Amino acid sequence: MGIDFVNKRALLILLFLSLSLQLFAHGDLSMRIAEKTVAISEDPNNAELYYERGLLYQEHIEYANALEDYHKSQALGNTDKAVYYSIAELHYLTEDYNEALKSIGTYLQVDSIDVRAKKLEAQILFQLQSYKKSLEAYRYVIHTMTDIRPEDILEYCDIILAENHKNHKAALEAIQAGLDQLGPHTLSLQLKKLDYLKESGQTEKALEQYNYFILQYNRKEFWYYKKAKFLAEINKPHEAFISLKLATVAIEQLKPKFKNMSPVVKLKEQINSLESSINNQKS
């Protein structure tokens, strides 16, 4: 009897896989979905099984099937807050932001201080262009999250500037707080700091930021050129010319194998082009 049951279970899994193999891109997920489907066929009133299969469908980007399983799980009595989060996340991924906001709102009624949920709420509000509310929610995330990442800081800055496109002061403060927390040489934050300094017209601080990159990184030739290009843009041709010469010197100091690499060859062309442009402006 036990062997017959095992054989029947294996047959059901193989049958499910053979019918749906073309629909599934990832073998491991396909197998796990198949196993959940067999388990549901054996225990059709198990709310947790439907929720678990819904998560697998969502991971497999089969959103309609995932949503159907989430609702079925709820209909069978699953009132856990995690279902509301998953539904909110799914609606967010499918760009149904109003429904996403309803679901995450229900979740937050149960657990108002959950950082992950507050972050999703902020992201949903951002897509709904409710920037002030989005900023409030994400501010809570930034001040509460213990495992903050550079991309969290950058997303927060995007919301700050969406709420007020001139508020580079707050964005730069957020970047600095991120650097203090994650380390002063966090590249993505330092790059964004340079962007914000340039966008806000803080030319001297932007030049200091270029100097930071020149001092910090071995391949100085690229940063000398970028600095020269910026100097030319702000009408400082003499300083730009000096920076181009320093870029050329840095290239000459490279080992032969690096000098002949296509990015360096292209950089030489860009240096020559910018030098010509500066000389033409002088004459």
Where are these regions (language model features)?
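N-terminal leader/linker segments that initiate helical-solenoid repeat arrays
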Residues: L23-H71, A75, S262-K282
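Terminal, low-structured helical/coil segments at or just beyond the last alpha-helical repeat
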Residues: P184, E208, F230, F241-S283
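Canonical positions in the second alpha-helix
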Residues: A39, K72-Q74, T106-Y107, Y140-I142, ...
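Register position in tetratricopeptide repeats
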Residues: E59, L93-T94, Q127-L128, L161-N164, ...
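Canonical tetratricopeptide repeat
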Residues: E52, S86-E89, L120, E155-Y156, ...
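Structural marker of alpha-solenoid helical repeat scaffolds
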Residues: E42, L76-G77, V110, T144-M145, ...
